[in-house]
UniProtKB/Swiss-Prot annotation:
Matching PROSITE patterns: RIBOSOMAL_L31E
Keywords: Ribonucleoprotein, Ribosomal protein
Family to which this protein belongs: Belongs to the eukaryotic ribosomal protein eL31 family.
Protein name: Large ribosomal subunit protein eL31
GO biological process terms, semicolon-separated: cytoplasmic translation
Top-level division of the source organism's lineage: Eukaryota
């Protein structure tokens, strides 16, 4: 399992509007966080999903009920360097700043390792 295929970074557009339809106003931002974690878990196949603090700021920027309709996310599957880690890989989700998230497709991002 330890190869280049296990570490990858992709950019996704997630439609939060359809995932939060019918959710009570006071539960929209917390549910958005849960939905993003669920999305990352599904697409990256990792149990351990970690969110960047900037992503949390983007979700909560307009308050608990003003969650953006769509968000552009960069999800990285990384190796877990901790000793006695339960999972060998984890996903790290961070926001990507774009003018409009409409019409964008999933892109594999080539990362420069320094």
């Amino acid at each position: 399992m330890a190869g280049l295929k296990d570490v990858v970074t992709r950019e996704y557009t997630i439609n939060l509007h359809k995932r939060l339809h019918g959710v009570t106003f006071k539960k929209r931002a917390p549910r958005a966080v849960k939905e993003i974690k669920k999305f990352a878990k599904l697409h990256m196949g990792t149990e351990d999903v970690r969110l960047d603090p900037r992503l949390n700021t983007e979700i909560w920027k307009r308050g608990v009920k003003g969650v953006p309709f769509r968000m552009r996310l960069r999800i990285s599957r990384r190796r877990n360097e901790e000793d006695n880690a339960k999972n060998p890989l984890f996903s790290y989700v961070e926001p990507v700043v774009v003018a409009s998230a409409k019409g964008l497709h999933t892109v594999v991002v080539e990362e420069e390792e320094a």
